[in-house]
């Protein structure tokens, strides 16, 4: 065989091997936390479809996390299952604008100011998810609370909220930060570990108010539309089982699954437990 022919054959074999490896990685990129086995994405989806709510944790400025979220959303939609997307990124008071966007009644030029009024990340990071929801008429749910409330709690504590501010929160909401929750927040938000005790307590209270309010919003939505699965996109600190999922479990019978990303020094294959999440996306 001529030298050129041998080189061509080797090149083709290398391409085939590369494609095979890429395919294998794409199908086996999920860690099932319960037994620490790496499983196929479709196997994970089979379990996620059993839940009322699927929480997907993200680091907001990691593009690969948003690709993972869209992959799960697309898999749900293509299965024909009724779906909605819950968003930490939007406040409840922007629900009318979210509905208008999904229904195609508002243009991108009209929606972008709404997006940036709610969220600080560049539009391209969430563009594909929001365009997919619009194209396929997947309802979007604004979960968050007004910025002024969370900022007040973070700076001055839950007790500093006035009556008007508390009226904007779910009825009967309280803020009981126990030692276990404080340690959870320290783990999830390494940047805040060195803050003074009182300031860190206020930060924990703000996180809990967020978690409880977003859980309440999810519960109210599912009570009105119980046949729909909600995929929730939120920061890892809210999406972990001790965050919003824990509040949903305490306040309702709705079931949930938690998918979190692999994050160096925070979420590791060896260190992650069933108290953190159900699945870890390895890519």
Q: Where do the protein language model's features map onto the residues?
A:
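Membrane-embedded segments
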Residues: 62-66, 76, 82-84, 92-102
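Solvent-exposed loop/turn segments at secondary-structure junctions
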Residues: 59-63, 90-94, 146-150, 236-239, ...
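Acidic/histidine-rich, surface-exposed loop or edge segments in extracytoplasmic proteins
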Residues: 49-57, 109-114
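C-terminal regions of proteins
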Residues: 213-216, 221-222, 228-231, 236-283
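N-terminal Sec-pathway targeting helices
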Residues: 2-13
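Short internal beta-strands
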Residues: 84-90, 258-262
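N- or domain-start disorder-to-order transition segments that initiate the globular core
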Residues: 18-51
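A substrate-binding/cap region within the structured catalytic cores of diverse enzymes
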Residues: 96-221
């Amino acid at each position: 065989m001529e030298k050129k022919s041998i080189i061509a054959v080797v090149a083709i074999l290398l391409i085939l091997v590369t494609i095979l490896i890429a395919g294998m990685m794409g199908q086996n990129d999920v860690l099932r936390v319960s037994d620490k086995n790496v499983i196929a994405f479709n196997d994970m989806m089979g379990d996620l479809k059993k839940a009322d709510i699927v929480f997907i944790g993200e680091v907001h400025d990691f593009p690969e996390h948003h690709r993972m979220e869209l992959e799960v959303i697309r898999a749900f939609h293509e299965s024909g299952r009724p779906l909605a997307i819950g968003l930490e990124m939007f406040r409840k008071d922007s629900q009318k604008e979210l509905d208008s966007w999904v229904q195609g009644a508002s243009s991108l030029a009209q929606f972008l100011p709404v997006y940036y009024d709610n969220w600080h990340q560049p539009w391209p990071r969430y563009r594909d998810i929001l365009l997919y929801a619009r194209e396929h008429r997947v309802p979007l749910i604004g979960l968050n609370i007004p910025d002024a409330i969370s900022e007040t709690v973070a700076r001055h504590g839950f007790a500093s909220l006035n009556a008007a501010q508390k009226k904007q929160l779910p009825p009967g909401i309280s803020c009981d930060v126990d030692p276990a929750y404080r340690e959870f927040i320290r783990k999830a938000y390494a940047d805040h570990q060195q803050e003074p005790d009182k300031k860190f307590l206020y930060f924990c209270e703000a996180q809990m108010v967020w978690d409880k309010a977003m859980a309440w919003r999810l519960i109210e939505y599912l009570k009105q539309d119980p046949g729909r699965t909600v995929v929730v996109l939120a920061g890892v600190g809210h999406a972990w089982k001790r965050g919003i999922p824990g509040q949903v479990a305490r306040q309702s019978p709705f079931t949930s699954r938690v998918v979190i990303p692999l994050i160096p020094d925070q979420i590791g294959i060896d260190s992650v437990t069933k108290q953190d999440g159900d699945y870890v996306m390895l890519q």
